[in-house]
From Swiss-Prot:
Protein keywords: Electron transport, Heme, Iron, Membrane, Metal-binding, Mitochondrion, Mitochondrion inner membrane, Respiratory chain, Transmembrane, Transmembrane helix, Transport, Ubiquinone
UniProt main location, coarse: mitochondrion
Protein's recorded name: Cytochrome b
Role of this protein: Component of the ubiquinol-cytochrome c reductase complex (complex III or cytochrome b-c1 complex) that is part of the mitochondrial respiratory chain. The b-c1 complex mediates electron transfer from ubiquinol to cytochrome c. Contributes to the generation of a proton gradient across the mitochondrial membrane that is then used for ATP synthesis.
Membrane topology type: Multi-pass membrane protein
Gene that specifies this protein: MT-CYB
Binding site for heme b b566: H97, H196
Residue spans crossing the bilayer: 33-53, 77-98, 113-133, 178-198, 226-246, 288-308, 320-340, 347-367
């Protein structure tokens, strides 16, 4: 008798995606982050659902409803901090997942990569709107500053900002619509994830060498299911350590003060995972230029397939580009640090130099080093 998982219309899809999927035998732990991101999304949707049962999206009661969740709801504090720190875990996994893709040349799977870039934008938008919901000082002023950036768009800027606000300032209408979008976007993300996987399974996974692995494939289950479970256990251990011992480590103390339009916090800054982009935004003195640089800092990922000059896919055997890659990683850490610092000397010039370096490495140096490496191997004939 044929196995039901191979014949049933629904189980057949699951079987081809997670059980009998032919997978390269040599993929390392860097390939674990896809499943970890799926786990993060599941955690965020579930905790978010339970938070939404008790949250009220009204400027008068939003802050106190979050306090009520933490104090009066059974395990509300746990759900709230799992959701807040789960977002940080989400971004840690996202950055590592994208970094893996850049290192091993996974961006040559164009459709998968582009859906991934769209997913990154969607997750960033969701996280930004979620940060506004507790209606603390940093929520309010973060929303004001970031939405205000759209006013830099010529002609329609001001109208666009007021349309997004639903009035002449960030107020009740803004909070309500942000809650609505924050609720719906994760489900759109989940749908995009399915499309992301669909395109990935058209080509099969990449591997550390960047070479074709058709000659050496193994079934996903049990080899990679058990490997993914180990990754999930490690991630959940780290998340729960954060939640139970250091719940406010990555948050801003200003957000424990209710939103007050009459009192601006001394340093308005986003959550840590946006600081690198925020530093790039601030490093350009012109408002429109800053906004364009901010968008381009993420959108540049979509250009990677066109900037690939080497005849080798992965950086595994390319020491010059490898060095540039790790300089880029260090550069992003510097940008993250600068984004959290006040706008004063020497932070301004450091931020500007780091921003120039960021774009130079990706747009100029890495493509050149790819050509040089090919010449050194006499592959440019």
């Amino acid at each position: 008798m044929t196995n039901i998982r191979k014949t049933h219309p629904l189980l057949k899809i699951i079987n081809h995606s997670f059980i009998d999927l032919p997978t390269p035998s040599n993929i390392s732990s860097w390939w674990n982050f896809g499943s970890l991101l799926g786990m993060c999304l599941t955690i965020q949707i579930l905790t978010g659902l339970f938070l939404a049962m008790h949250y009220t999206s009204d400027t008068m009661t939003a802050f106190s409803s979050v306090t009520h969740i933490c104090r009066d709801v059974n395990y509300g504090w746990l759900i709230r901090y799992m959701h807040a720190n789960g977002a940080s875990m989400f971004f840690i996994c996202l950055f590592l997942h994208v970094g893996r893709g850049m290192y091993y040349g996974s961006y040559t799977f164009m459709e998968t990569w582009n859906i991934g870039v769209i997913l990154l934008f969607a997750v960033m938008a969701t996280a930004f709107m979620g940060y506004v919901l507790p209606w603390g000082q940093m929520s309010f002023w973060g929303a004001t500053v970031i939405t205000n950036l759209l006013s830099a768009i010529p002609y329609i800027g001001t109208t666009l900002v007021e349309w997004i606000w639903g009035g002449f300032s960030v107020d009740k209408a803004t909070l309500t619509r942000f809650f609505a979008f924050h609720f719906i976007l994760p489900f759109i993300i989940a749908a995009l994830v399915i499309v992301h996987l669909l395109f990935l399974h058209e080509t099969g996974s990449n591997n550390p060498t960047g070479l074709n692995s058709d000659a050496d494939k193994i079934p996903f289950h049990p080899y990679y299911t058990i490997k993914d479970i180990l990754g999930v256990l490690m991630m959940i251990s780290f998340l729960m350590t954060l939640v139970l011992f250091f719940p406010d480590l990555l948050g801003d103390p200003d957000n424990y003060m209710p939103a007050n339009p009459l009192n601006t916090p001394p340093h308005i800054k986003p959550e840590w995972y946006f600081l690198f982009a925020y530093a790039i935004l601030r490093s350009i003195p012109n408002k429109l230029g800053g906004v364009l640089a901010l968008i381009l800092s993420i959108l540049i990922l979509a250009l990677l397939p066109f900037l690939h000059t080497s005849k080798q896919r992965s950086l595994m055997f390319r020491p010059i580009t490898q060095t540039l890659y790790w300089i880029l990683v260090a550069n992003l850490l510097i940008l993250t640090w600068i984004g959290g610092q006040p706008v004063e000397h020497p932070f301004i010039i450091i931020g500007q130099l780091a921003s120039i370096s960021y774009f130079s490495i990706i747009l100029v140096l890495m493509p050149i080093s790819g050509i040089i490496e090919d010449k050194m191997l006499k592959w440019n004939l």
